[in-house]
A protein has these predicted regions:
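Hydrophobic helical membrane-anchoring modules
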Residues: 2-7, 184-321
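Residues in soluble alpha-helical coiled-coils and helical-bundle/repeat scaffolds
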Residues: 17-21, 104, 108, 176, ...
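Conserved amphipathic alpha-helical interaction elements at protein-protein interfaces in regulatory
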Residues: 18, 32, 36, 61, ...
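Residue-level signature of catalytic and energy-coupling elements of molecular machines
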Residues: 30, 87, 102, 124, ...
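Structured catalytic core of nucleotide-sugar glycosyltransferases
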Residues: 2-133
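Acceptor/aglycone-binding surface of glycosyltransferases and processive sugar-polymer synthases
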Residues: 61, 72-76, 80-90, 106-188, ...
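Short conserved micro-motifs on helix faces and helix-strand junctions that flank
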Residues: 15, 74-76, 165, 238, ...
Length: 321
């Protein structure tokens, strides 16, 4: 006999990549959270993003001992942004809490998120007061990036806000529909709207292991964020081209008048080289910006699935959902 329950279901969504050392500690912290909130039905959903260590075996063991644990195993490493989309596709809860596996985002904050969710908020996000072990340079880079993105984008991209948040089911269903290949999920959270609420917290240090997010990956994410939510770089290139043309015209008029009225000889070769190098640099810069956008269009028009799931729990898949 099937017993119908009126309990709301909460999905904890955790993308993981080479997190074998963190999983036991993470699982214990999550179980403490679950036990404190027994009024809800819980799903602990891990998305294994092509880990090369024993992360998948650890997830299988957790699944064997606790059927509330589900896992999606991607066929290769697609990146955290895509792993989150896979999690949204497989999440079954009335709300979904997105969090990192490194415990820098404390699970204890979920209790307060659930309270705001019950009050009617759709997107309860955690805003960092402090940023833990981050270096001064990385912190300044982050501030500069968000400052640039705020000025270029037409939507309000929130600074010091990561992926750690609770999303109502309708937010999850909306995010499922956004299937672009090159993803900047922090921007998508802001783009979809809905009623939002912030919770401030002090982000701790990573307990063990090291982050896979190096400077180049962060720089690539910054480029994705800017090109996903703004065409301002294209306009900047256009403005630079116009300014260079006007400057060149004024420069030519100046030397023409100087030669005709005063008979001064123009030092042609050095001037020509300087102008050519300057204009060549502007052209290459503009082509690079155009190339970024054309590359994004090329990837989207191929129509490939955003990810391929290899396993869902004990079920072999080998296709995209």
């Amino acid at each position: 006999m099937i017993v119908k329950t009126d309990m709301k279901k909460v999905t904890l969504l955790i993308p993981v990549y080479n997190e074998e050392a963190m999983l036991p500690t993470l699982y214990q912290r999550l179980i403490e959270l679950v036990n404190r909130n027994a009024v809800y039905e819980w799903e602990i959903l891990f998305v294994n993003d092509g880990s090369s260590d024993t992360t998948l075996e650890c997830l299988r063991r957790l699944r064997q001992q606790d059927k509330r644990v589900n896992y999606v195993n991607l066929s290769r490493n697609f990146g955290k942004e895509v792993a989150m989309l896979a999690g949204f596709d497989y999440a079954t809860g009335d709300c979904c809490v997105v969090m990192d596996a490194d415990l820098q985002d404390p699970p204890e904050l979920v209790d307060q998120m659930l309270e705001y969710w019950e009050e009617g908020y759709d997107d309860i996000y955690a805003k960092r007061r402090t940023r833990g072990e981050e270096s001064w340079l990385r912190r300044q880079f982050s501030l500069a990036f968000y400052g640039i993105l705020q000025r270029m984008s037409r939507i309000d991209i929130l600074p010091n806000v990561g992926d750690f948040r609770l999303l109502d089911r309708r937010c999850v269903l909306t995010l499922r529909r956004l299937r672009e290949c090159e993803r900047y999920t922090k921007g998508l959270f802001c783009w979809i709207g809905y009623q939002k609420k912030s919770i401030e917290f002090d982000r701790g240090d990573r307990l063990m292991g090291h982050s896979s997010w190096n400077f180049l990956k962060l720089l690539n994410l910054a480029v994705e964020g800017i090109t996903s939510f703004s065409i301002a770089p294209l306009r900047i290139a256009t403005v630079c081209g116009v300014l260079c043309s006007i400057s060149s015209f004024i420069y030519a008029i100046y030397f023409l008048i100087k030669t005709v009225l005063y008979g001064d000889e123009t030092a042609g070769f050095p001037t020509l080289i300087i102008v050519m190098l300057f204009l060549g640099g502007i052209q290459l810069f503009s082509l690079g910006i155009i190339g970024e956008y054309v590359g994004r269009i090329f990837k989207e028009t191929k129509g490939r699935p955003t990810y391929i799931a290899s396993d869902y729990n004990e079920e072999k898949l080998g296709y995209d959902r």
